[in-house]
Amino acid sequence: MDTYMPPLSVGEFLKGEFMIPLGLSAYKLAKDINVPVSRIQEILANRRKLSMDSALRLAHYFGTSDHYFIDLQTKVSLEAAKLVVKKEIESLPTYEETMEKGRKSRE
């Protein structure tokens, strides 16, 4: 049985893996990393992607690598994009296929 699960958003991950276990509110996190509360709220609500600035602030605050949060955002964005263009991408030829077609047309 193939069940579809949408990619976890950065906001869901941030909330579930960091904020809830540590008892952090959006207000406290925003205040501590010196960003507007609305920025954190929008990230949590999946209305805003994580910027480099936010990713670096979160990485410093939570003691992760500089790449941790931006890599997470990249993975989430990639999975979302794949869902949108999957069928079109699959219908495109590969480089090898175009080369083979070119060889056959010259024969």
Protein language model regions, located:
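Short, charged recognition helix plus adjacent turn
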Residues: 70-107
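Key DNA-contact positions within bacterial/archaeal DNA-binding proteins
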Residues: 27, 38, 67
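A short, Lys/Arg-rich alpha-helix, primarily the initiator
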Residues: 1-24, 71
